[in-house]
A protein has these predicted regions:
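Alpha-helical transmembrane segments in multi-pass integral membrane proteins
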Residues: 1-12, 22-50, 67-79, 105, ...
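Residues within membrane-spanning alpha-helices of integral membrane proteins
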Residues: 14, 18-21, 56, 63, ...
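Specific transmembrane helices
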Residues: 59-60, 65-69, 88-113, 301, ...
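Hydrophobic, aromatic-rich transmembrane alpha-helices
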Residues: 100, 147-156, 160-161, 168
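Function-critical hydrophobic alpha-helical transmembrane segments in multi-pass membrane proteins
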Residues: 130-154
Length: 367
């Protein structure tokens, strides 16, 4: 017998988180720390890693789904806003501000960048002329802008109006990216600005709203989940690599595939097939995904320095080994730090919420 799709704790979503964060690590970890000519296999591996950015889009879809669901399920509460924003602050700020402190002490990011990141404006650093940034914080800023505005909209609108609005968001964001191509504006704007990255969040929100519509039936999702994943995946493969498509429709195709994958995971995780989405290794990385996402660039930087200092000569002769050592070394270091962060820092603040009668927190299935 099937369980409800929406439950207080959905362990299969940790698998989705784990896959998403490992894709991002694959992108940054395969960057060559040393010079040299790659073998054919190494070149294929490196080229594949350049599409690890799809993990960010998967995170956006998952975040839109979870946050919208949390808001919908609590919007009748008198403490709706206070509960949500305190919970978000307890989840996000401690690890983020700890990272910003490390970046300031080590000088790995400029003080102006750290200042705008403190205010969740890292995705506008380029517009402000700020250099020497820390890559991953742009996406965190996009999500925070969503968190700041979306609760007010969810509170006021009916499910039907919200469904219409999310469709407009899903279609409108790629339309803005297409308009960008006809204007003499640097393409990185399309990668980082909030309004160019809303289709993933909107599609995740749409899924959360649809699953809560009175007329929704499980069979409806079962009919569209796999086709959406396959259609989005095929479209992404066809579009990816074309300069005009990478910043426009390829992202939308990726978001559609991500929403289909998320839907398939929800269906399997609440059915007799749940063993097929119960992958302990991905659940572990999902458990530490937030800290891992924050710290991994710093960890890969350390791995690159160590390789360049101690193994520069032999690894120059074998750049594939250099690339793999860079990835594995950074992954191990980032995983260790992220696990310590989760256990000793993040959960310390989460327990504040658990023990408070004013703020109720779900089990640790956070974005």
């Amino acid at each position: 017998m099937n369980s409800p799709l929406i439950r207080d704790y959905m362990p299969e979503l940790d698998v989705v988180r784990g896959i998403a964060v490992l894709l991002v690590l694959f992108l940054h970890g395969m960057a060559l720390p040393l010079q040299g000519e790659l073998s054919t296999f190494g070149r294929v591996l490196y080229d594949l890693s350049q599409y690890g950015w799809v993990g960010v889009n998967l995170f956006f879809v998952l975040s839109g789904f979870l946050i919208t669901g949390i808001l919908l399920d609590s919007r009748h509460r008198p403490d709706y806003f206070r509960r949500f924003y305190i919970r978000r602050a307890l989840r996000i700020l401690p690890a983020l501000y700890a990272l910003l402190l490390i970046l300031e002490i080590t000088g790995l990011a400029s003080s102006p960048f750290i200042a705008v990141s403190f205010l969740f404006l890292a995705n506008f650093a380029g517009f402000l002329g700020i250099t020497k940034g820390y890559g991953v914080l742009w996406s965190l800023a996009v999500e925070e802008h969503f968190y700041m505005l979306w609760p007010f909209i969810v509170r006021k609108c009916s499910l039907r109006k919200l469904l219409t609005l999310t469709i407009v968001i899903f279609l409108g964001s790629p339309f803005l990216r297409i308009l960008l191509l006809v204007n003499p504006v640097p393409q990185h704007y399309a990668s980082f600005y909030t309004w160019f990255n809303l289709d993933g969040l909107g599609l995740g929100a749409l899924l959360a709203i649809w699953l809560r519509m009175p007329s929704f039936r499980r069979a409806q999702l079962a009919r569209v989940a796999l086709p959406a994943m396959l259609l989005g995946g095929v479209a992404f493969v066809m579009l990816a690599g074309h300069p005009w498509a990478d910043v426009t429709l390829a992202k939308t195709a990726c978001n559609l595939a991500s929403a289909g994958f998320l839907s398939c995971t929800l269906l399997a995780g609440s059915s007799k097939w749940k063993a097929y989405v119960d992958w302990p290794i991905f659940k572990f990385f999902g458990f530490i995904s937030y800290g891992l996402y924050l710290i991994h660039i710093l960890a890969f930087h350390v791995a690159s320095i160590l390789l360049s200092h101690y193994l520069a000569t032999p690894l120059t002769r074998n750049p594939l080994a250099a690339m793999l050592l860079h990835f594995c070394g950074g992954l191990v270091l980032a995983t260790a730090i992220a696990y310590l962060s989760r256990r000793s820092l993040e959960e310390r603040f989460l327990r504040i919420g658990y023990s408070s009668r004013r703020v109720e927190l779900l089990r640790p299935s956070f974005v």
